[in-house]
From Swiss-Prot:
Function statement: One of the primary rRNA binding proteins, it binds directly to 16S rRNA central domain where it helps coordinate assembly of the platform of the 30S subunit.
Gene Ontology molecular functions: rRNA binding; structural constituent of ribosome
Protein name: Small ribosomal subunit protein uS8
Entry annotated with the keyword Ribosomal protein: yes
UniProt subunit comment: Part of the 30S ribosomal subunit. Contacts proteins S5 and S12.
The keyword rRNA-binding is assigned to this record: yes
Alphabetized NCBIfam families for the sequence: PRK00136.1
One GO term (biological process): translation
Any GO CC annotation of this UniProt entry: ribonucleoprotein complex
Entry-linked PROSITE patterns: RIBOSOMAL_S8
A Pfam family hit: Ribosomal_S8
Amino acid sequence: MGMTSDSIANLLTRIRNALMAEHLYVDIEHSKMLEAIVRILKQHGFVAHFLVKEENRKRLMRVFLRYGEDRRPVIHALKRVSKPSRRVYVSAAKIPYVFGNMGIAVLSTPQGVLEGSVARAKNVGGELLCLVW
């Protein structure tokens, strides 16, 4: 399995590397799933903002990264949970609380891509895509 076959792992790695290099933004190939994940990151203050742009007939998503007062990334970790080789599904009751509730879980559910506390409130489980804190 090549890296590119897992676009979510690729997204997380690209963000992680860009943060370590102190980049202002990172460009990622667009998909509805990835946009939904990035939108949740934005809602929770983990990224500044994002925009979708066409370049050479390819849709790209430009994700603007966030750093704290001390110029350190506000994201401490991005962890892929479910993988193409080993899917991880959880019921609403088993959705993890991440890093003392400072972090978030992102799930793909029958009601779309949801943050853990939202899925828990709606009482829906799903595929546990990643954890961010």
